[in-house]
Design a protein with these regions (language model features):
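Core of compact, soluble alpha-helical bundle domains
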Residues: 15-161
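Bacterial N-terminal signal peptides
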Residues: 1-11
Length: 161
């Protein structure tokens, strides 16, 4: 994930502007190429454990939500969000999806995101917040890549425009 992000950042600095479609295609390709390595790491130690368990996942989620709350791309709907509830639901979702014991009881991804009318650019912006939050919390490239690829696997469920 960091390699792809740095490649796109370098392209922008060099005066090139990768399109949203190019960035999405790059993420999909990265996730496809790393699928076996990610599965092997998860089989050895579930991502839940490598993320540090429930408390650290909640702290990471709170940082993601904090970054979303100050992200200008999300101002248009942030006022209607209950941050505490969102942190709990996302933490439970991440815990469940990474091999932890929590049971996610929230809405499915299409239902939870449909009213937000997210574009591919919004998706990339949210993914950037996830990567920065994980870096802020000290996670390594493997864990960041795995979280990004989990998000990429759900892109068709949340991108609606």
């Amino acid at each position: 994930a960091l390699v792809v992000w740095l490649a796109f950042t370098s392209a922008v600095i060099a005066g090139e502007s990768p399109t949203v479609e190019d960035q999405m295609a790059g993420l999909v390709a990265m996730c496809a190429e790393s699928e076996q390595a990610r599965a092997q790491r998860h089989a050895e130690t579930p991502l839940y454990d490598r993320l540090g368990g429930s408390e650290k996942i909640t702290a990471m989620t709170a940082e993601i939500i904090r970054l979303h709350s100050i992200n200008p791309d999300f101002r248009r709907f942030w006022g209607e969000i209950d941050e505490e509830r969102l942190i709990k639901n996302v933490s439970d979702f991440v815990s469940t999806g990474t091999g932890g014991p929590k049971v996610y009881e929230g809405r499915d991804m299409p239902s939870a995101h449909a009213h937000l009318e997210l574009s591919a650019a919004d998706f990339l912006s949210a993914g950037g917040d996830v990567m920065h939050a994980m870096q802020n919390k000290g996670y390594g490239e493997n864990e960041i890549q795995e979280m990004v690829c989990i998000l990429v696997s759900m892109k068709d469920q949340v991108i609606t425009k």
